[in-house]
Amino acid sequence: MLMSLTNEQQERFQILLQQLQIPDDLINQYLQGGGIERLVIDKANKSWHFDLQVPRILPTELYELLETKLKQSFSHIARTTFALETENKQFTEEEVRAYWPLCTERITFSPMFAYLKKQLPQVNGVKLLINVNNELESTALKKNVAKPVGDQYEVFGFPRFQLDTHIQQNTEEMQKFREQTQQEDRERVIQAMEEMAKKQAEESSVVYEGPITLGYLIKPDEEITPMREIQDEERRKTVQGYVFHVETKELRSGRTLLTLKITDYTDSIMIKMFSRDKEDIPMLQSLKKGMWVKARGSVQNDTFVRDLVMIANDINEITGPSRKDKAPEGEKRVELHLHTPMSQMDAVTPVSKLVAQAGKWGHEAIAVTDHAVAQSFPEAYSAGKKAGVKVIYGVEANLVNDGVPIAYNEAHRLLAEETYVVFDVETTGLSAVYDTVIELAAVKVKGGEIIDRFESFANPHQPLSATIIELTGITDDMLTDAPEVDEVFKKFEEWMGDHTLVAHNASFDMGFINVGFKKAGLEKTNNPVIDTLELARFLFPEMKNHRLNTMCKKLDIELTQHHRAIYDTEATGYLLVKMLKDVIEKGFEYHDQLNDSMGQGDAYKRGRPSHMTLLATSDVGLKNLYKLVSYSHLNYFYRVPRVPRSLLKKYREGILVGTACDKGEVFEAMMQKAPEEVEEIAQFYDYIEVMPPEVLRHLVERELVRDEGQLKTIISNLVKLGETLDKPVVATGNVHYLDPEDAMYRKILVSSQGGANPLNRHSLPPVHFRTTDEMLECFSFLGEDKAKEVVVTNTQKIASLIGDVHPVKDDLYTPKIEGADDETRDMSYKMARSIYGEELPEIVEARLEKELKSIIGHGFAVIYLISHKLVKKSLVDGYLVGSRGSVGSSFVATMMEITEVNPLPPHYVCPKCKQSEFFNDGSVGSGFDLPDKECPACNIPYVKDGHDIPFETFLGFKGDKVPDIDLNFSGEYQPRAHNYTKVLFGEDYVYRAGTIGTVAEKTAYGYVKGYANDHNLTIRNAEIDRLVAGCTGVKRTTGQHPGGIIVVPDYMDIFDFSPIQYPADSIGAEWRTTHFDFHSIHDNLLKLDILGHDDPTVIRMLQDLSGIDPKTIPTDDPEVMKIFSGPESLGVTEEQINCKTGTLGIPEFGTKFVRQMLEETKPTTFSELVQISGLSHGTDVWLGNANELIYNGTCTLSEVIGCRDDIMVYLIYQGLDPSLAFKIMESVRKGKGVPEEWEEDMKNNNVPGWYIDSCKKIKYMFPKAHAAAYVLMAVRIAYFKVHFALLFYAAYFTVRADDFDVEAMAKGSASIRARIDEIAQKGLDAAPKEKSLLTVLEMTLEMCERGYSFQKVDLYRSHATEFIIDGDTLIPPFNAVPGLGTNAALSIVEARKNGDFLSKEDLQQRSKVSKTIIEYLDSQGCLGDLPDQNQLSLF
């Protein structure tokens, strides 16, 4: 009986699901709202039984996953079982039938009932109907099976079923009846599908225009309930919000269900509405994401989604609120400091939306300044052109000094003889200007000893903050009777004399000294100074930090009470003594030598980076900016990419330098240093940035600034500084997202990084994109005129200094190779004439000329020539190359040996006299399928070739599409092919194609749930979905394309196109990558796809073993073709190898999915195999499409649409214009279907209705050239499997297999079958390694059943990594041993070169393998009679 779940039961269920690691999408879809009704623990039998309640019947896959995970998770505690109770008892016949195999597996019954497993029950209400042959069977079944079946289905969550039987009629008559009814069913289905397609087409053509009003109009004054206030079921509520998800679904009843998810940014809610009549449907379908709606209805607990949902009666489209920039035209601000999702895990709004918003507000320009990167530039460039907004390209970079001085006021004084005044100050804050000293202490050090002390409190005449009291231990009471600050400084000045001053972080302490001296009427001190912090960084660069307490611990110096001046001073004195000894030993004898190493080596690591803004004013500046970004990532990366000041000076041309945010050195100096110091620092910059006080409020929170009043004073002083230095002061927003309500996305992202992100140490300020009037309000404290100057006038002025900058080129820049056009033409014609004769057939010459005109005319010849060189090098080195993608559509590529696929129509050609015969009527699918035929003139066999593939599928209808030549090199050869590009072009002209890894939806879901848990929030599912969407797409890391090589022409350099970096900032990686995602520069630079693949490696090994040139292998061998429909040509039966085909281990045809396709289609020709390859790689091409057409007898395998090119070729043969045929092919392959007007053209040219319907279903299609190349490799490998079996298995196990069970393999078929059964019985419980092993064992069984066998691993004959043929057996390599990796395997082989092993001990010592491996080899008899230890001799 269904019970009402408590919150605790639901929460425990969610915890259980998380522990079981059930994917979040499955939980959300099927298990949300479920619970644990009870848990029954049987301690005696060590068993746990869970009674679980779930919303509805689960898919069988999910049921089995739950079962598997429960067993795995509690295997060490108890045996687990569970039963399901479903809240919604509705089920379909398909669901009942899906569970039938599980049911029959779990019931123990007599073998007489085994036939139950081979049939599926019919379902009638709660009755299951089973076919039986007679009354006796019926009685036995009801008596013995009915109850366990009912019990088992109840466990699955179904209602209790009754078992009924149906006695079959005469089998032959029954079969005829079935066939007749099946045929009628098929015809009805086809008719229904055609009618449905027609109906859908008619309905989809109706588009509703105008404001949408579903139901009644909702009055403007009706009370709106904020969504956050909806916490329970309500009878009638009205909400309004932004639509962020829309879905419409046609129900079986004929009604349409609309599902919306909307937000008012206080929360989100799902809204459901059912159509009332046909007139509703166009309006339902016209609701789109991005609209604002008002909805009225009842709020209910939805049992399906397990959440509060509004069932709407009325939905009205409304105009949503939006921020407007109210400033007059021409008086609008320019944002000069803005971050995009390319600021790693920090900003959330896509740059295209930000630029578009600037355009809507009438802003003339907008700057992009991500943290240290330029990766948003390409998207920003496109967005700027679209919105008519000037985009200013910049970076917020990390500036470091080339080296921070160790010594100031340098003097020629002997370090060993000097007297040092080591001092420390405790203060009310960090600012020498706004804060004051409360304690000043010092010691004099000479000859390694403390010779005098100075200590005094100072009265600040203000209460201390709690933070200062806690940090220093100094209280207000301790300062009440202290001397005045001026008095303390005067005494100290007299006491210190002209000795060398020493402090830990001297720039901070000296700031207070100099300001204190000035206020006391004293001169600024010119005493020499040593900074022990920088001295420590110089002497101990390997340490992560050099704080005083850290250094004291390292050098064993006592630090009694850190952050009390006198104790810190004494500790610093002893630290100085020890470090001076080290520095003198390094050869530094005088004070004025201490800075001699400044800026050398990794000095850039020792400074603390300051932010600065860099804006490119021209293309020259952009190139320099790319260099700065590149070198900061390549040469100066330490925790973050750093820009040394000297590097910026070198590449400053065309760049404006701004002071950036509160992390910039000018703002920090204004907070902490004397005005003259600030002026000196600010001289380096071109303009000064100020930000709204609320953007900087975290400084007050962190007590770096006393209050908002002081913060405004600092901003005002920055404005005055600009006036003093005649530098423009600009108001910037430090934008990280578009609207205020987007702040939550950033909070979640920052929170996900925990303590690693310093932003988690304070609340995040509001950093949305502000309008002009919002920004003017922020700076109103400056006065109206000054506010307008910094917000509008000066930002426009900076924008006016920026010229026309182009971060992305408009053209393709290919490498130039002298004579490439002629060489491409000559090479193509030379090869063509060598095959087809000096007088080329018209069809050949026309195709060559057509292609060469496009290739040479558009500057693509060099791309072909480079690809030719790469392939040629691989072929010379002994490795075949497979082509991918559509390059096989190009006959020029075939003639240049870039691909083996010949795209001409199927044909014969005589290898001697060159006579040819072409079949260009579509009657033959592939030249390889033509019957053998001899040349009548020469009486020698014709060569057969041609796959009938149009050139247009490669370079487009106009032949102007940039060639994308993908090549499959051997996996073991791929690194050599990559490095060969460096030989061809030079190391500075080839780069790996960069990639950018962003936050995926599933990861974002984890962030949102984590944030909710950390902040004790209960969030509705709809709100979770909104937050997840807002967090996706933000940059997490960078990487590299597995095979993409970007080539820069030698007349340009990479910085003309993109910055460069190491992948994932992995310093010292073998390859540098493009900084931009390679898609951004795809149309500007040549990208070579040099991919690694197993097939060429297998072919190379087979060639080495057999001596057979793979190119000479026939492609129509009858025995080879047979394996695609059965295993008989291998000399085994289906029963022997548990497989209905012979394609185990054949690339592209060995997977269960494709083997099932082969069983259903029984291909017999090469072209049909190409069809299978295309069908298996497409989306919605086979399942629910071609397979049904073949099953229904509508058409044959060769007639269905298998590859994209088939569409164009077929339609041309049917009479359609080639241009239209190409457009239809492109539309279908992209999943866009066939527009109505094109459908009419197809019908007018007798294209059958089933063909058109099939086109409409397709979402993605495979290129025929790719399929043909794959099949060619597969057929060659299959040839070895049929005719040179042991060679095939040796190559397969060496190259493709990863997991082995050498013990079972060596014992033969029975042992292998037992191991297969053992793994198979585990089902989903099987570990990933076991699943991988299962494939290997299937191959092993097949090999053994063909009469071959495995030996044990042999200590003296086994290879490290390759299976060795020995008669009719294979000797496994060492790395087939469990736990023995390739390096250890090589170590054994290397060790045995030095002579036989004396003992197991000797083997372990010489090979360095583990004792466990030795014991395993011994247990398998691999070590023979090798003794345990070396025998000792007495003489």
UniProtKB/Swiss-Prot annotation:
Its EC number is 2.7.7.7. Belongs to the DNA polymerase type-C family. PolC subfamily. It catalyses: DNA(n) + a 2'-deoxyribonucleoside 5'-triphosphate = DNA(n+1) + diphosphate. It is found in: Cytoplasm. The keyword Magnesium does not apply. GO terms for biological process: DNA-templated DNA replication. Keywords: Cytoplasm, DNA replication, DNA-directed DNA polymerase, Exonuclease, Hydrolase, Nuclease, Nucleotidyltransferase, Transferase. Residues 420-576 form the Exonuclease domain. It is an enzyme of class 2 (transferase). It comes from Bacillus cereus (strain ATCC 14579 / DSM 31 / CCUG 7414 / JCM 2152 / NBRC 15305 / NCIMB 9373 / NCTC 2599 / NRRL B-3711). Transmembrane segments: none annotated. One of its GO terms (molecular function) is DNA binding. It comes from the Bacteria. The gene is polC. GO terms for cellular component: cytoplasm. Required for replicative DNA synthesis. This DNA polymerase also exhibits 3' to 5' exonuclease activity. This is DNA polymerase III PolC-type.
